[in-house]
Amino acid sequence: MSKEKQAQSKAHKAQQAISSAKSLSTQKSKMSELERATRDGAAIGKKRADIAKKIADKAKQLSSYQAKQFKADEQAVKKVAQEQKRLSDERTKHEAFIKQSLSSMRTTASATMEAEEEYDFFISHASEDKEAFVQDLVAALRDLGAKIFYDAYTLKVGDSLRRKIDQGLANSKFGIVVLSEHFFSKQWPARELDGLTAMEIGGQTRILPIWHKVSYDEVRRFSPSLADKVALNTSLKSVEEIAKELHSLI
């Protein structure tokens, strides 16, 4: 039996005893018991109510916590989904970047392979000497199997002239320089000669001068260092003879 029921039972018995008491002292004694039982019952009832209130408060707190936790879980799931989407988008962008980079690398590699094509001879000349000598020399060398960097054959529409010539200079074993009055008056062939000279100093190539209708004094005035080099002379040898001597060097 619970304490509350025990207190109620005592109060009931005390009430009955008061009704049946024959003496005043017995009534007073039972009245005291009734008061104690009533107080005990009230205290127990209050305590039970307090406990019930606490339980209700805890239940309310639990419900509130569960609601907050549910909302937090929803937000966490949403954040995870957003993060997964972000990672997926980043991965997609990264894959696209890698594909683009690979494509660029392939293009660069292809261009590099083309740029690194090697030649036996680079021919530096003035355009005015093409028909009179250079074209025939190139044809004779090609007939002998030599690989020539010659603008009429090597340069294509859209090519960068300066870059292609720099590539030709860098990837040729020998630099043939056709020295003529036209050559001496041109800036572009002179730049090519500067490039060949720098490479010869670096041990990367050799300059092979050909004198075309010029004298020693004219060459010396243009470049004393070239005048001292052993040269082939179009006034002394035919195109075929010059081509054979040049081809013998490779």
Curated annotation (Swiss-Prot):
Q: What is its EC number?
A: 3.2.2.-, 3.2.2.6
* Phenotype of the disrupted gene, per the record: Significantly slowed infection in IRF-1-/- mice infected with strain 16M / GR023 deletion bacteria, increased expression of TNF and interleukin-beta. Slightly reduced colonization of BALB/c mice 5 weeks post-infection.
Q: Which GO terms describe its cellular component?
A: extracellular region; host cell plasma membrane; membrane
Which GO biological process annotations does it have?
signal transduction; symbiont-mediated perturbation of host microtubule cytoskeleton
Query: What reactions does this protein catalyze?
Result: NAD(+) + H2O = ADP-D-ribose + nicotinamide + H(+); NAD(+) = 2'cADPR + nicotinamide + H(+)
Disordered: where is this region?
1-46
> What is the annotated localization of this protein?
Secreted; Host cell membrane
The domain of life is Bacteria
Organism (species) = Brucella melitensis biotype 1 (strain ATCC 23456 / CCUG 17765 / NCTC 10094 / 16M)
Write down what this protein is called. Probable 2' cyclic ADP-D-ribose synthase TcpB
State where composition is biased (Basic and acidic residues). Answer: 30-39
Q: Does the keyword Hydrolase apply?
A: yes
* Protein function: Virulence factor that interferes with host Toll-like receptor 2 (TLR2) and TLR4 signaling, resulting in the reduction of dendritic cell maturation, inhibition of pro-inflammatory cytokine secretion and impaired NF-kappa-B activation in macrophages. Interferes with host TLR4 signaling by abolishing host TLR4-TIRAP interaction (but not host TIRAP-MYD88 interaction) and its downstream signaling. Inhibits host TLR 2 induced NF-kappa-B activation and TNF (tumor necrosis factor) secretion. Binds phosphoinositide (PtdIns) via its N-terminal domain.
Alphabetical UniProt keywords: Host cell membrane, Host membrane, Hydrolase, Lipid-binding, Membrane, NAD, Secreted, Virulence
Q: How does it assemble?
A: Homodimer; may also form oligomers. Interacts with host TIRAP. Interacts with host MYD88. Interaction with host MYD88 was not confirmed by another study. Interacts with host TLR4. Abolishes the interaction of host TIRAP with TLR4.
| Documented effect of changing residue 220 to A | No longer inhibits TLR4-mediated activation of NF-kappa-B
Instruction: Locate the region Necessary and sufficient for phosphoinositide binding.
Output: 1-117
Name of the gene this protein is made from: tcpB
Q: Which GO terms describe its molecular function?
A: hydrolase activity; identical protein binding; lipid binding
Q: What residue stretches are annotated with the TIR domain?
A: 117-250
Query: What SMART domains does the record point to?
Result: TIR
Domain remark text: The TIR domain mediates NAD(+) hydrolase (NADase) activity. The TIR domain crystallizes as a homodimer. The TIR domain is a structural mimic of the TIR domain of host TIRAP. Whole protein and the TIR domain (residues 120-250) abolish the interaction of host proteins TIRAP and TLR4. The N-terminal region is required for localization to the host cell membrane while the TIR domain is required for tubule formation.
Q: Which PANTHER family match?
A: TIR DOMAIN-CONTAINING PROTEIN (PTHR32009:SF39), TMV RESISTANCE PROTEIN N-LIKE (PTHR32009)
Residue stretches of biased makeup (Low complexity): 14-23
Enzyme active site: 192
Q: What is the predominant subcellular site recorded for this chain?
A: secreted
